[in-house]
Amino acid sequence: MKLRKIFAAVLLFLSAGTAMAQQMPAIPVDKNVKIGRLDNGLTYYIRHNSYPEHVASFYIAQKVGSINENDDQRGLAHLLEHLAFNGTDHFKGNSLQDYLQSIGVQYGRNLNAYTAVEKTVYYFTDVPTTRTTAVDSCMLILKDWSNGISLTKEAINDERDVVHNEYRMRIVGQQRMIERSLPKLYQGEKYGYRFPIGLMSVIDGCKPETLRAYYRKWYRPDNQAIIIVGDVDVNHIEAKIKELFSGIKVPKNAAKIEKVEVSDNDSAIYVIDKDKEQQVDLFQIYMKHNAVPDSLKSNMSYLLKGYMDNVISSMIAARFAEKALEPDCPYLQANAGDGSYLISSTKDAFTLTGVAKPGKIKEAYAAVLREAQRMHEFGFTATEYQRAKDEFMSQVDKALANKDKMKNEQFTTQYVDNFTSNEPIPSVEEESQIWKMVVPNLPLEVINSYAKQLVCQSDTNLVSLVMMREQAGAVYPTEQELSAIVKQVRAEKLEAYVDNVKQEPLIAQAPKAGKIKKTVENKKLGFKELTLSNGAKVVLKKTDFKDNEIAFAASANVGYSTFGKEDFLNAAFAADVLDASGLGDFSSNELDKALAGKQAGVSFSLSPFNHGLKGNSTPKDIETLMQLIYLKMTAVSKDQKSFDNMKSMMATVLANKSNNPSLVYQDSVQSTLYLGSKLARVPEASDIKDINYDRILEIGKQFYGNAKDFTFYFVGNYDEKTLLPLIEQYIASLPNNGFKLKNKQIPYANGEVSNIFTKAMENPQNQATEIWYTKAPFTLKNYVLADVSARLLEMKYLRTIREELSAAYHAGANYGLLRDYDNKAAISISAVAQLNPEKSDIAIPYFFKGMDETVAQPNAEDLQKVKEILLKQAAVSEKTNGYWLGALSTYERMGVDTHSDYKEMVKNLKASEISDFLKNVILKSGNHFEIIMKAVKNGK
């Protein structure tokens, strides 16, 4: 079929005419995935993938979610998902989690599940595949999840409180308003009452047999898919699937999965809500239209629709961002895109989203709608479209170059979507060929014709949701006012957008190149260290982990602790402000346009005792990366519009800080640890006006003007013959300004400190953190001991606080090991949980009990699990460029090799060493900090 006919068919397809579209070619299915279906209807996807090697991911996807619940079952899909981890036919109680952790699968990170409106998915990832018995056991778990979840009365009753705890954690502020608004947004239809977390009254009151009946009704092989991707024998996996799943029967007259339709609305729907915990005034404008039926998603028209949605979204987002920089713009940020209408799959919408400046909700609503109307009337310009095409194709080229280095989850996500909603799954090569044929030939007229269709010109299928901060004296828009704005904007005489583009190179004249003075090779860690003529050092490590990736970092051993109190605020915001500034002769907006289609980026990083840069590129765009490095260190330019927009955004977000329990608690933790210093606290809205742009630019010059202070790291698939001259051109040429900076100590808590306070909130939940802290040498041994100790404690806390007490959705432990101002390590072990207020006083002592028990005798089984997890994670991580950036930086800055002996140290770690570390390093210091936020209901 000729391209002209294809494009005509696409427009017909998008206008809800399917006859022409059905004549178009089908999207090819990737031949490297084995797809099959058993006689009982079970679907399976199996793919061999050896990146990373020796691990695989196991999924079971169900075409079942909250939409399948009856009115008296709201929340059962989610409760059932929880109970899949609390006992099955072959794995009683918590033995499923215990077994998976024993082979290196970490709960939460690698083992989890989620319930959506129309699907429920269970998975465990990065499973070691060197033992066939482990692979077979994992498949047995999938089989149990299919039809063997125990659902004992005891497990159901225990899990009710856990779901309550999750509800307290998730349903806050904006989520609360969405849940309240759904019935009206869906005109009282079923989707309006199927938020996946459900009703707590149903969770509390459902009888065990009711849940079992729901499970039997919907969890059937004809609604399920097994998805296994990784370093596995495909034939063995297929044979095992047939052996385990073929015998599962589908009941006669089994209930059918039926799509729930969403009605059109003849007149506009306006929903305005407010909440005390909402941080910003936000609105969404939906322009509803029919979704593409699943049956047509394998059609080429659907793929082309996705492309057009992508470029339209990127082009209008760029317009919104440019407009937001104008001083009189009433919104802080905005975006638009076409996709599902809220939580439904059977109705789509072109959705506009905006965040208003304080007191400007109506003006912002009009401004965002106006840009959509401008798109409707005039479309986009040729230069805008060219940038969008360039960016899209650069992503396509990057994916193609890395086609053999795709992680398992990139495939499993695609296969879940293919099974549940027939999303296409072409190979990267096939999709790349399609885009290289279509994109250069798809004219702007087709894009603009489609964009015109997206913006409705009547009130039919127009829906607006406004979510605002509840504040004294605030004025909220009415439905009548919003309706009047819509009519006004549609009647306005608009002008076409003018695209102003700077046609200049990033660097007009290349700097005078320096020289590489010395090269030293470290064979143990496989890198080269270059010393340059300006005193800077460069560390190079060539890898083939990703064919099209070069990771970059630069660091110097001084941070914002060097400045006095008068500069704390400026220092805290310096990295963000510098990143939002211009470079050379380019404003931030002009720079975004100039970099379209380039896979290269650099950003500033700044911490108390370190400053630097971080970024990445492809081999093709390595010179752009080097130019950005040079400009970031020599030519940050003032962009007042960008700075003012950033200040407005920060001030708006922080204005309601005192009503946001999460921010209040975070601020309390930081204030307790850093003795109230502004350097560490969450700032107040009133602080933002005191940020001094000129002073930040001066701080930037002091920090980044001394090349000799820096070590630059490049890890990835670079060509050394190409890279070395660029290093001489853009890094060896960097100046030294003579500033001498030195880290200073930041006051930090010591001894026994307690901060217990009360906070009113809508869904009360307590938060507790217990921190044990010390100073010690920065060594590999301390690094391993701190990590292992925290993991052992978390296993205890999950068993006791979550499982036995049902006092929290999650109870965990973390470790911190950071370089301090004096080059020693600041080591901390933290116990954390968001707690049921009624059980908080009972649960908190278990933090200390867990610590005492681990000091006395670490659990031997848990220790072995932790070792397996760490060894597995190390094997996977060490095949990534990011891992090596961290390892080489630690080696260069601290003189500590965290790689070479790591696995042996983990393998040989003894329980007695952990006890000694906790007792004589962590606890002996006597530094213990407790921060507890006790919740009370708003209005009480």
Residue ranges and their predicted role:
Residues R74-H82, N86, S314, F568-D576, ...:
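Active-site recognition of the HExxH zinc-binding catalytic motif
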Residues A21-I46, D233-Y307, S313-A317, L325, ...:
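Proteolytic maturation boundary segments
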Residues G65, G87-T88:
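Post-signal peptide N-terminal segment of secreted/secretory-pathway proteins
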Residues A155, R160-R168, V172-N223, I227-V229, ...:
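Hydrophobic, small-residue-rich alpha-helical packing segments that form membrane-like cores
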Residues L185, L211, F392, I696, ...:
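Acidic/histidine-enriched active-site and ligand-binding environments that engage anionic O-linkages
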Residues M1-Q23:
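Bacterial Sec-dependent N-terminal signal peptides
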Residues G148, R160-D161, L211-K242, T460-L462, ...:
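Non-catalytic, conformational "gating/processing" segments within enzyme and secreted inhibitor domains
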Residues Y45-R47, P52-E69, L76-A77, N94-D144, ...:
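M16 family metallopeptidases and their MPP-like homologs
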